[in-house]
Amino acid sequence: MTNRLLCAFLFIFGLLIHPPAVLPGQIIVDSEKQFQLAFQALEKGEYQRAVVEFERFIHFFPEDEKVPRARYLIGVCYLRGKRYETARKFLEEVYRAYYPKPVSGKALFLIGESYFRQGFPEEAAGFFKKVIETYPQPELKNAAIYRLGWSRMQKDKWQEASKTFNLVEKSSRLYPSASDLSDKALMGEDLPYKSPTTAGVLAIVPGLGHVYTDRYKDGMVALLLNGLTIWAAVEAFNQDLNVLGGVLVALELGWYSGNIYSAINGAHKYNRKVRADFRRNLTDSLNLNLFTSREVPLGLALKIDF
């Protein structure tokens, strides 16, 4: 009996000296689990939730080796969510904070990618060039060359684009696509083209400039509208309705100048559409998963009190 009491006493005393690691009202947050929770939200396309989870990770584990990557992936979330200016803000911070580490090179590339996706290929090209000049990592460098080729195609610089695609190394996974695009880029020089100047000159005869740009319906409308207005103005003056005639002449000047402007603008639209359709039918093989691949180092643990 005495032995049992002694054992019970020692057991209770041991609990008092070494309490449980987790007390009621506490949870353990593991750095690796927290990071993976954020990463899984990113993979599912839940970008705002992923941002919150990455920020929570950074807050609780500011010394963790994955903090640079977490900050970088916040920028990726905003990029994928098409919040390009916000993405650039975070990516620029990563670039400045961790230069010249590889994560800064990826951040610099994605700043260029944000401009490319926004439709600013000239601005994007500057960042891709900087990646090529600064970062020797083959995958990153070849991706920047590949995207620089696309940026030049967006500006209708077909020969420059072709030469750029040829710079992608044969060892790169992008090489087959780059080789194909190098040939197809040159086809852009042979795409149909409508001269805006010619369209404007032809529009001296109302509607003819529209016909030149294959806008036959608009050409017919322009011809009828201008023709009827001119006829009505002439009839008004013939019947001594000078005020009405003056109003009709003023209207016709507006219709006529609008007809010329519309024909010139139509030529520009035609050229843009033909080239955009051509580019749309080309295959872009750049996979941005290259920039969000998993890394699995061991993590720390942190207790949080409710």
Give the location of each predicted region.
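Alpha-helical segment of the N-proximal tetratricopeptide repeat
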Residues: 30-61, 76, 80
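Residues in the short coil linking paired helices within alpha-helical repeat scaffolds
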Residues: 46, 66, 83, 103, ...
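Canonical tetratricopeptide repeat
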Residues: 70-73, 107-110, 147, 181
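Hydrophobic alpha-helical membrane-anchor/signal-helix detector
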Residues: 192-269
